[in-house]
Amino acid sequence: MTQDTSTYYVWIGGSCDYGHKERAGGAAVVIEHNDNIISRDVISDLHTTEFRMMLTLMIKVMHEIPEGSDILFLTNAAYIQNFDKTPTAKSANRTSSESKDASLLAISAESRGRKARANPDLIIQCIEEKERHNSVGVKIVQYHKSPLLIETHDRATEAMAKTRKEFHQKNK
């Protein structure tokens, strides 16, 4: 991929472990500008999903990159393509059976009688941060052809495992 030297290229990936009751989620970024890696970041938390973590990290990145910039998020997670779409009543209250992004989450939420959320709180913050910039977009890339994307997933998975381990050590 040919890069424009004025654009910030933000490789972003996430990971979530639906198999644990404390369900850790994580996200990581590698930021390129002027053909150089200028920053790496990773976040994780318990009782969340990789999608919430990815949106949270997108907000942080858009806040930290200088105002008026061009930003392109590169990912294999189609979910975040809607980071700048105003939440509707339907998307904010999507039933778990309508969730197309995480069938495991849908099954899990459905079995507990809850609705899967479309993260309207984070989408609104993304929209606000996007307004500070000249342009912000998302490009879907192939995972196996993108070493920096693979790195983000690995770092998110490591952070998630560390968060879970610290939780269990603290609660022994």
Model-predicted segments: where are they?
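Intrinsic disorder/low-structure terminal segments
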Residues: T7-Y8, L72, Q142, E166
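Short, surface-exposed, polar/charged, turn-prone segments marking secondary-structure boundaries
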Residues: N36-R40, M58-I59, D101-A102, I124-I127, ...
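Loop-to-helix element that buttresses phosphate recognition and phosphoryl-transfer chemistry
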Residues: M53, L57
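RNase H catalytic domain
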Residues: S15-K21, I59-H153
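Charged phosphate-binding loop/patch that engages nucleotide di/tri-phosphates or the phosphate backbone
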Residues: I150-K172
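RNase H-like nuclease fold core
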Residues: M1-R52, H63-E64, K162-R164
